Protein backbone atom coordinates (compact mmCIF):
# COMPACT_ATOMS: atom_id res chain seq x y z
CA UNK A 1 0.00 0.00 0.00
CA UNK A 2 1.25 3.48 -0.85
CA UNK A 3 0.92 4.78 2.71
CA UNK A 4 3.45 2.25 3.96
CA UNK A 5 5.80 3.17 1.13
CA UNK A 6 5.40 6.85 2.02
CA UNK A 7 6.33 6.18 5.65
CA UNK A 8 9.25 3.99 4.62
CA UNK A 9 10.63 6.65 2.29
CA UNK A 10 10.27 9.34 4.95
CA UNK A 11 11.79 7.13 7.64
CA UNK A 12 14.84 6.20 5.57
CA UNK A 13 16.81 9.05 7.23
CA UNK A 14 17.94 9.36 10.87
CA UNK A 15 15.89 12.26 12.22
CA UNK A 16 16.45 14.05 15.51
CA UNK A 17 12.75 14.86 15.81
CA UNK A 18 9.63 14.03 13.83
CA UNK A 19 6.08 15.32 13.80
CA UNK A 20 3.02 15.21 11.57
CA UNK A 21 0.19 17.59 10.73
CA UNK A 22 -3.05 16.37 9.19
CA UNK A 23 -5.61 18.99 8.21
CA UNK A 24 -8.57 19.86 6.01
CA UNK A 25 -10.51 23.06 5.35
CA UNK A 26 -13.66 23.55 3.34
CA UNK A 27 -16.86 25.49 2.81
CA UNK A 28 -19.83 24.28 4.83
CA UNK A 29 -23.42 24.12 3.62
CA UNK A 30 -25.84 26.72 2.35
CA UNK A 31 -27.76 27.49 5.55
CA UNK A 32 -26.43 29.74 8.31
CA UNK A 33 -26.21 27.78 11.55
CA UNK A 34 -26.95 28.74 15.14
CA UNK A 35 -24.17 28.69 17.73
CA UNK A 36 -25.68 25.54 19.24
CA UNK A 37 -25.58 23.75 15.88
CA UNK A 38 -21.95 24.79 15.33
CA UNK A 39 -21.02 23.47 18.77
CA UNK A 40 -22.71 20.14 18.06
CA UNK A 41 -20.82 19.81 14.76
CA UNK A 42 -17.48 20.46 16.48
CA UNK A 43 -18.28 18.03 19.31
CA UNK A 44 -19.23 15.29 16.85
CA UNK A 45 -15.93 15.82 15.02
CA UNK A 46 -14.07 15.59 18.34
CA UNK A 47 -15.91 12.38 19.22
CA UNK A 48 -14.94 10.82 15.89
CA UNK A 49 -11.29 11.84 16.37
CA UNK A 50 -11.40 10.35 19.88
CA UNK A 51 -10.89 13.29 22.25
CA UNK A 52 -13.04 14.35 25.22
CA UNK A 53 -10.97 16.81 27.30
CA UNK A 54 -11.37 19.69 24.88
CA UNK A 55 -12.36 23.29 25.48
CA UNK A 56 -14.65 25.39 23.29
CA UNK A 57 -14.37 29.15 22.91
CA UNK A 58 -15.99 31.71 20.66
CA UNK A 59 -14.47 34.89 19.26
CA UNK A 60 -15.67 37.66 16.99
CA UNK A 61 -13.45 40.09 15.11
CA UNK A 62 -14.50 42.48 12.38
CA UNK A 63 -16.83 40.40 10.20
CA UNK A 64 -15.51 37.00 11.26
CA UNK A 65 -17.03 34.79 13.95
CA UNK A 66 -15.03 31.76 15.06
CA UNK A 67 -16.06 28.88 17.30
CA UNK A 68 -13.00 26.84 18.25
CA UNK A 69 -12.64 23.44 19.87
CA UNK A 70 -9.14 22.49 21.02
CA UNK A 71 -7.26 19.95 23.07
CA UNK A 72 -3.51 19.91 23.74
CA UNK A 73 -1.34 17.15 25.14
CA UNK A 74 2.24 15.92 25.35
CA UNK A 75 1.90 13.80 22.22
CA UNK A 76 -0.08 16.20 20.07
CA UNK A 77 -3.04 18.50 19.69
CA UNK A 78 -6.41 18.82 17.95
CA UNK A 79 -7.90 22.05 16.65
CA UNK A 80 -11.36 22.32 15.06
CA UNK A 81 -12.78 25.65 13.93
CA UNK A 82 -16.15 26.71 12.58
CA UNK A 83 -15.69 30.05 10.85
CA UNK A 84 -18.51 32.34 9.71
CA UNK A 85 -17.77 35.39 7.57
CA UNK A 86 -20.31 38.21 7.26
CA UNK A 87 -19.86 41.02 4.75
CA UNK A 88 -22.23 43.83 3.94
CA UNK A 89 -24.34 43.15 0.84
CA UNK A 90 -22.59 39.78 0.40
CA UNK A 91 -23.94 36.35 1.28
CA UNK A 92 -22.37 34.91 4.43
CA UNK A 93 -19.80 32.12 4.14
CA UNK A 94 -19.16 29.27 6.57
CA UNK A 95 -16.03 27.12 6.76
CA UNK A 96 -14.93 24.13 8.80
CA UNK A 97 -11.27 23.49 9.66
CA UNK A 98 -9.98 20.33 11.32
CA UNK A 99 -6.32 19.87 12.23
CA UNK A 100 -4.44 17.16 14.13
CA UNK A 101 -0.78 17.52 15.14
CA UNK A 102 1.26 14.49 16.24
CA UNK A 103 4.53 14.96 18.13
CA UNK A 104 7.48 12.55 18.15
CA UNK A 105 5.76 10.11 15.79
CA UNK A 106 4.22 9.92 12.34
CA UNK A 107 2.84 6.39 12.66
CA UNK A 108 -0.84 7.32 13.13
CA UNK A 109 -0.88 10.02 10.44
CA UNK A 110 -3.00 8.15 7.93
CA UNK A 111 -5.39 6.88 10.60
CA UNK A 112 -6.24 10.52 11.31
CA UNK A 113 -6.24 11.33 7.60
CA UNK A 114 -8.94 8.70 7.12
CA UNK A 115 -10.95 10.01 10.09
CA UNK A 116 -10.81 13.61 8.90
CA UNK A 117 -11.75 12.56 5.38
CA UNK A 118 -14.76 10.66 6.74
CA UNK A 119 -15.87 13.67 8.80
CA UNK A 120 -15.66 15.97 5.79
CA UNK A 121 -17.45 13.52 3.50
CA UNK A 122 -20.27 13.00 6.01
CA UNK A 123 -20.76 16.77 6.12
CA UNK A 124 -20.64 16.89 2.31
CA UNK A 125 -17.63 19.23 2.35
CA UNK A 126 -15.59 18.95 -0.83
CA UNK A 127 -11.95 19.32 0.19
CA UNK A 128 -8.51 17.71 0.23
CA UNK A 129 -6.95 16.30 3.39
CA UNK A 130 -3.32 17.32 3.67
CA UNK A 131 -0.78 15.09 5.42
CA UNK A 132 2.52 16.79 6.30
CA UNK A 133 5.42 14.79 7.76
CA UNK A 134 8.35 16.74 9.17
CA UNK A 135 11.77 15.67 10.43
CA UNK A 136 15.02 17.36 11.48
CA UNK A 137 18.51 16.23 10.55
CA UNK A 138 21.65 17.62 12.19
CA UNK A 139 23.87 19.65 9.88
CA UNK A 140 23.59 21.03 6.36
CA UNK A 141 23.19 19.37 2.97
CA UNK A 142 24.64 20.67 -0.27
CA UNK A 143 22.28 21.37 -3.16
CA UNK A 144 23.39 18.13 -4.79
CA UNK A 145 22.76 16.19 -1.57
CA UNK A 146 19.28 17.73 -1.26
CA UNK A 147 18.48 16.70 -4.82
CA UNK A 148 19.71 13.16 -4.20
CA UNK A 149 17.87 12.94 -0.87
CA UNK A 150 14.60 13.97 -2.53
CA UNK A 151 15.15 11.69 -5.53
CA UNK A 152 15.81 8.71 -3.26
CA UNK A 153 12.47 9.35 -1.53
CA UNK A 154 10.68 9.66 -4.87
CA UNK A 155 12.26 6.44 -6.11
CA UNK A 156 11.05 4.56 -3.03
CA UNK A 157 7.53 5.94 -3.64
CA UNK A 158 7.68 5.30 -7.39
CA UNK A 159 6.72 8.95 -7.83
CA UNK A 160 7.58 10.89 -10.98
CA UNK A 161 9.27 14.27 -10.59
CA UNK A 162 7.28 17.15 -12.08
CA UNK A 163 9.27 20.17 -10.85
CA UNK A 164 12.39 20.62 -8.69
CA UNK A 165 13.50 24.08 -7.68
CA UNK A 166 16.14 25.71 -5.44
CA UNK A 167 15.20 28.98 -3.71
CA UNK A 168 17.81 30.27 -1.26
CA UNK A 169 18.28 27.46 1.31
CA UNK A 170 15.17 25.50 0.32
CA UNK A 171 14.86 22.77 -2.30
CA UNK A 172 11.26 22.05 -3.30
CA UNK A 173 10.01 19.09 -5.31
CA UNK A 174 6.57 18.49 -6.79
CA UNK A 175 5.85 14.97 -8.00
CA UNK A 176 3.05 12.58 -8.93
CA UNK A 177 2.28 9.03 -7.92
CA UNK A 178 -0.62 7.30 -9.65
CA UNK A 179 -1.21 5.17 -6.54
CA UNK A 180 -2.66 8.22 -4.73
CA UNK A 181 -6.23 8.88 -5.77
CA UNK A 182 -6.23 12.63 -5.09
CA UNK A 183 -4.09 15.22 -6.83
CA UNK A 184 -3.97 18.90 -7.72
CA UNK A 185 -2.91 20.53 -10.96
CA UNK A 186 0.15 22.79 -11.25
CA UNK A 187 0.00 24.07 -14.79
CA UNK A 188 -0.52 20.97 -16.90
CA UNK A 189 1.08 18.62 -14.35
CA UNK A 190 -0.68 16.39 -11.83
CA UNK A 191 0.87 16.74 -8.36
CA UNK A 192 0.20 14.78 -5.17
CA UNK A 193 3.63 14.49 -3.54
CA UNK A 194 5.53 17.50 -2.23
CA UNK A 195 9.01 17.42 -0.69
CA UNK A 196 10.72 20.47 0.82
CA UNK A 197 14.23 20.44 2.25
CA UNK A 198 15.39 23.56 4.08
CA UNK A 199 18.25 24.60 6.35
CA UNK A 200 18.31 26.64 9.57
CA UNK A 201 21.79 28.12 9.96
CA UNK A 202 21.30 29.19 13.59
CA UNK A 203 20.29 25.69 14.68
CA UNK A 204 22.52 23.97 12.12
CA UNK A 205 19.58 21.76 11.20
CA UNK A 206 18.14 20.53 7.94
CA UNK A 207 14.36 20.13 7.95
CA UNK A 208 12.65 17.67 5.63
CA UNK A 209 8.94 17.98 4.79
CA UNK A 210 7.08 15.24 2.96
CA UNK A 211 3.44 15.98 2.18
CA UNK A 212 0.53 14.68 0.20
CA UNK A 213 -0.92 16.24 -1.83
CA UNK A 214 0.77 19.54 -0.85
CA UNK A 215 2.82 21.00 2.02
CA UNK A 216 0.69 23.59 3.82
CA UNK A 217 3.29 24.63 6.41
CA UNK A 218 5.80 27.46 6.51
CA UNK A 219 9.36 26.39 5.76
Give the location of each predicted region.
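Intrinsically disordered, low-complexity segments enriched in Gly and acidic/Ser/Thr residues
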Residues: 137-189
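Short Lys/Arg-enriched alpha/beta "domain-start" segment
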Residues: 7-70, 74
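Soluble, non-membrane globular domain cores that form compact, hydrophobic packing
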Residues: 9, 87-92, 110, 117-128, ...
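A cross-kingdom marker for long, charged
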Residues: 181-219
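Short, small-residue-biased leader/transition segments that mark boundaries at the very start
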Residues: 1-6
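Extracytoplasmic beta-rich ectodomain segments of secreted or membrane-anchored proteins
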Residues: 47, 55-142
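Ser/Thr-rich, low-complexity intrinsically disordered terminal regions
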Residues: 54-76, 162-183
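Short, hydrophobic/proline-enriched secondary-structure or compact coil segments at domain edges
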Residues: 20-29, 92-101, 207-213
